[in-house]
Amino acid sequence: MFKRSLKVLLSNPPINRVKPSSTIIQPLSNTTTTTIINNNNITNFEKMTHKKSMTIDNICQNVRNAQYAVRGELVIRAEAISHQLQKQKTEGTKTLPFEEIVYCNIGNPQQLKQKPLTYFRQVVSLVECPDLLDNPYVEKIYPADVISRAKEILGSINNTTGAYSNSQGIGLVLRSVADFIERRDGHKSDPSEIFLTDGASVGVQRILKLLIKDRSDGILIPIPQYPLYSATIELYNGSQLGYLLNEEKGWSLEISQLEHSYNDAVSKGINPRALVIINPGNPTGQCLDRANMEEIVKFCLEKNVVLLADEVYQENVYVKESKPFISFKKVVKDMGGDYADLEMVSFHSVSKGFVGECGKRGGYMELNGVTQDVKAEIYKLASIGLCPNVIGQLVVDLMVRPPVAGEQSHDLYLKERDNIYESLKKRANLLTNALNNLEGVTCNPSEGAMYAFPQIRLPAKAVEYANSIGKAPDAYYCIQLLEATGICVVPGSGFGQKDGTWHFRTTFLPSEEAIEGVCKRIADFHQSFMNKYK
C-alpha cells in the first residue's frame, strides 16, 4: 500500500510543501486520484469509476410499465406542495392560495380526521402493553369487556404481539372470521379455507401470482378499475382483459361486455383465468343486485374462470333498502349444485367500511371450491412472507367480532359506527349533487364505497393543449385543480375509461365541516377552468 501510494504521489507532485499536519493535496491533472498526507503517513483514496449494475433499461421492465395512479404523479406533486406549505408556515410567508393539501386521492379515512373506534384502540393498547393489565387502576380506565377481550387475545398469541404467527393466521382470528361469514351469509364457513393478509391487497397479489404464468394468461378486470389489478397483472407479466361498465346505466355490469372481452382474448390466444368483480365498485361506487350476481356466477362456471370477489366496501352501502350488500359466497351457496363449488376467492379488509384502519394493514381472503393441492401452494406463498402482521390480524378479529348487546362497550361502539356511516352517506350525496351542478359534469350516485367518479366534458381547447404537452386531458385538469385549490384527486385515465371520455375520482372523506368547502373550491376552480378554455 505504501509503495502504491508513493508512486501516486510522485506522479502527481503537490503544488505546496507538505506540512506535518493533515493536508489534502490536489493533483495537477484532472485525474480520479486524491492523495492525503497525514503526519508523514501517505494514504491514497481513488474514486472508483465503474458501470452501474442496475440501470433503468436493465431492471425488470414490468416494474417500469406498471402504473398505480392512486399514488402517482398527482400525489408526488401534492407532497412537494405540502413541503412548500410547511416552509411557508415556518417563514411566515404566503405564496399559495390555500393552506393545506386535501388528499381526496385515496380511501384513507383517518388521514382526513375520521376518529378510530374506541373499542378497537382500547383493546389493541392493552394487547400491545400487557403490563397495563396488572396496573391497579386498569379497571377504572378500561371497560370490563375490553379487559376480558385483551386477555383472551393475549392467551391466543402467547402474551406477545412481537412473535410470528402461523403463516395462515392466528387460529382465534380465523375462527372469528369463519363465524362472521356464517352469520352474514347463512352458510357454513371453514377456518381452514381462510387466510389472513396484510390488507386485502396482499391477498389479491398472491392469487394473481398463482394464476399468471406469462402473457398468455389474462385476467378480466372492470373498466374503470382499481389500479391494484392492472399494476399487479403487469408486474406478473399477465394480460389485462378489460370489460367496460355502462356509465349510462349507473355503471352496470352487462354480461354481453364480459362475453365480448372473453371472446376477444381467446381469439388472440390469451387464456382468461379469472374475473375480477369489485362490489361495491371502486372507483364507480355502484352496487350489484342479486340477479346480476347470478348472471356473473353462471358466466364464470360456463367459461371455467375463477371469480375474484373484491368486497372490501361491503359495509359502505348507502342504498340498503334497494340494493343491500350480498356476498358472492352467499349467492353461489344459495344457487346450489355446481355453482356452490365455483372456484372463487373473496376479499375483505379493515381499511374500509366504518373501521377505516388503513395503517393497521389487516384483511382476509376466503377460498371456495379450491382444491387441496392448490391451497397448499397458496399456503406456500403465505409462508414465504412468514406471516401477516399480528396487530392487523387482531384488528380483523375486532372487526368481525365487535362488542355485543349486554357488553359495556356495545352502546358506544354502535353510536360511533352509526355516526360514521350516516355521515359518509350524507357526504356522498352532498358531493355528487355539487358535482352534478357543474358545467359539463355528470356524476352517477355513489351507492357504495367512498368515491365519486364524475365525467367531465372538457372544452376542445383544453384537450388540445393537454395533448400538446403530453398529458391526458383529465390528468391536466386534475393537476390544475391541485395547483389552484390544494385538492388532490385522481384522473380517470389512471383507472381506465371509455375512449373519448374524461373523469376523475375523488373521495367524500373530508369531514362534514370540510366537505362543503371542498365542493365550493372545486366549483370555483371548474368555472374558471371552463372559462379559460372556451
UniProtKB/Swiss-Prot annotation:
Transit peptide: 1-18
GO MF term set: L-alanine:2-oxoglutarate aminotransferase activity; pyridoxal phosphate binding
Localization annotation: Mitochondrion matrix
Pathway: Amino-acid degradation; L-alanine degradation via transaminase pathway; pyruvate from L-alanine: step 1/1
Keyword Chloroplast: no
Cofactor: pyridoxal 5'-phosphate
Coiled coil: none
GO biological process per UniProt: biosynthetic process; L-alanine catabolic process
InterPro entries listed in its UniProt record: ALAT1/2-like, Aminotransferase_I/II_large, PyrdxlP-dep_Trfase, PyrdxlP-dep_Trfase_major, PyrdxlP-dep_Trfase_small
Keyword Transcription regulation: no
UniProt enzyme class: transferase
Annotated positions of the N6-(pyridoxal phosphate)lysine modification: 352
Enzyme Commission number(s): 2.6.1.2
Catalytic reactions of this protein: L-alanine + 2-oxoglutarate = pyruvate + L-glutamate
Assembly and oligomerization: Homodimer.
Protein name, entry field: Probable alanine aminotransferase, mitochondrial
Species the sequence originates in: Dictyostelium discoideum
